[in-house]
């Protein structure tokens, strides 16, 4: 229902007009879908391999998601368990 005194058809957001370009998706760059751990098969995912595990953690010590590292889901699960095990044994910091 419309109440008296309320304007209809005007833009309620202020001085900006509707722009269909504002709702378009932002362009993004496609990353390669290849798993970086598949290329170097001689390195296995182990909790004692600090150099490999530190590549998949942020500078704050958090585990990077697979959409950033482009690691397959199976390797991501192995990485997360190895990182958690290395944290528990004080080989990697928690933060």
Swiss-Prot record:
Coiled-coil blocks: none
PANTHER family, A to Z: 30S RIBOSOMAL PROTEIN S18, SMALL RIBOSOMAL SUBUNIT PROTEIN BS18M
Keyword tRNA-binding: no
Keyword Disulfide bond: no
One of the GO BP terms on file: translation
Name of the protein in its database record: Small ribosomal subunit protein bS18
Region forming the signal peptide: none
Species name: Ehrlichia ruminantium (strain Gardel)
Stated role: Binds as a heterodimer with protein bS6 to the central domain of the 16S rRNA, where it helps stabilize the platform of the 30S subunit.
Protein family per UniProt: Belongs to the bacterial ribosomal protein bS18 family.
Gene3D superfamilies: Ribosomal protein S18 (4.10.640.10)
Self-association and partners: Part of the 30S ribosomal subunit. Forms a tight heterodimer with protein bS6.
GO molecular function per UniProt: small ribosomal subunit rRNA binding; structural constituent of ribosome
InterPro entries cross-referenced by the UniProt entry: Ribosomal_bS18, Ribosomal_bS18_sf
GO cellular component, one term: cytosolic small ribosomal subunit
Record gene name: rpsR
Entry keywords, A to Z: Ribonucleoprotein, Ribosomal protein, RNA-binding, rRNA-binding
């Amino acid at each position: 229902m419309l109440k008296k005194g309320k304007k209809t058809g005007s833009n309620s957001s202020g001085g900006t007009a509707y722009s269909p370009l504002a709702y378009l998706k932002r362009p993004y760059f496609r990353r390669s879908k290849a798993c970086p751990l598949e290329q170097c098969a001689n390195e296995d995912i182990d909790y004692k391999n600090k150099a490999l595990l530190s590549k998949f953690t942020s500078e704050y010590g958090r585990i990077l998601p697979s959409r950033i590292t482009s690691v397959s889901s199976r390797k991501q699960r192995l990485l997360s368990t190895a990182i958690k095990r290395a944290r528990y044994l004080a080989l990697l910091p928690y933060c």
